[in-house]
From Swiss-Prot:
Keywords: ATP-binding, Chaperone, Nucleotide-binding
Superkingdom of the organism of origin: Archaea
Gene3D superfamilies referenced in this protein's UniProt entry, alphabetically: GroEL (3.50.7.10), GroEL-like equatorial domain (1.10.560.10), TCP-1-like chaperonin intermediate domain (3.30.260.10)
Organism phylogeny: Archaea, Methanobacteriati, Methanobacteriota, Methanomada group, Methanobacteria
TM stretches of this protein: none
PROSITE patterns: TCP1_1, TCP1_2, TCP1_3
Name of this protein: Thermosome subunit alpha
Amino acid sequence: MAQGQQPIFILPQDTSRYVGREAQRINILAGKVLAETVRTTLGPKGMDKMLVDSLGDIVITNDGVTILREMDISHPAAKMLVEVAKTQEDEVGDGTTTAVIIAGELLKEAEKLIEMGVHPTIIALGYRNAALKAQEILEEISMEASDRDTLMKVAITAMTGKGSERAKEKLAELVVDAVMQVEEDGEIDKDNINIQRIQGASVNESRIVNGIVIDKSRADTSMPKRIEKARIALLKYPIEVKDLETDAKIRLTDPSQMQAFIEQEEQMIRDMVEKIKSSGANVVFCQKGIDDLALHYLSREGIMALKRVKKSDIKRIEKATGARLVTNIDDLTAEDLGEAGVIYEKKIFDEVLTFIEECRDPKAISIILRGSTKHVAEEMERALEDAIGVVASTLEDREVVAGGGAPEVEIARKLREYADTISGREQLAVSAFADALEIVPKTLAENAGLDSIDVLVDLRAAHEESPYMGIDVFDGNIVDMKEAGVIEPQRVKKQAIQSAAEAAEMILRIDDMIAARGFDVSSKDEEDMEGMGGMGGMPPMM
């Protein structure tokens, strides 16, 4: 700037900006630390995390996406990896920790290449091609899954090490039965499986309800508590006199006029109840409120009614009973009613629930999940949700791969062969991608208290003979995972590798960070981050 000229501020003076290698280093560090945070939770021997929020509420879990969601991370690069975990959870239901640690390792390997002088664009291109090749290799080593026994193995593998160890066979049975029941034309909507978590009993008392359970009680205690041969009406709008859409004032000159108004309102309510009765309905689920007078008349007619039922529950009741949601009571007919063998109210532990059972071929069902304490029941629920996701994926795709780190080692082996066919610096990126994938078997070994280097060497040697060789973390041996029954959906691995590669590529392409306010990474903070392997003591990351 020439002498005497005033400086020009394009950005606010309190803005932080990091350019080039500095920006890349900060983002890579954030990704590495985040991956290190969840790494110890991977596998059957993984450890749990205790998360305590500002209100003192405690969550104890080893579920990757739950940990990341509860941590409330604000660092922009770290948030990208959190999104990877959330996408993995939404798409396939499991593999969240795997996806995050692969992404973190890809960034770690990329950092080495950048220090060697390889441009981030070349690394990103190599990663993209390696990810595509990995998908092809996964197809080659996949196995067909078509029977119930395979689905059971998939469910048990997903739940192993997630707090449900003692009852995993029982829970796997529930999951497989539930998923197969709600399947429609080869597709599974996981929302049609409702998990009702109730503490106060052994997990072995968990069961499937051939229908739906909702956490609602009768709208009035004078109504029947149990209805056999239930005929179900679903109403979208309230059973009450509608308010005027515009403000209006009415002048009354005689007390009898007031009485006439009251009688007219009562008659309208009676007509609504009569319409419900004439349709043949003996149970009503209303999405909105129900007038007290309407409750009185419904009770007098022996009709059970529940008000303010959640929209999601209404949808499941539709699927389970065949009922149709009616927007106007005047349009309600017998054809709109659903059927169930019995509907009853029951108190379990300290919760009052309504059971809709003995439905004819329900396409939405409930699982009653028991647990001795609140924290146990919550972790069981997370394990069950993971298992439902992987069984649904398997049933839809009918493709599985071996577990125990077998697919990662096989893909890494073949990627190194593929790298030898590539010229230029991109070859280094493909080889780095292969090295990064081996973080999965290494972590499984470390979490089991084994020597990761010895395990990895043995695995590489075993894969010269079979692509299904993985690590048995319970005895430390290298075994055929296919024969051991440790299998996972192909979709879980595909999604994890693809999402991790895309996130790493996106982070590597960032060469300029502009933070509006308060974002700063001092050298001291970086030393703290590198030395901790967790997220605490890290102001810029939280």
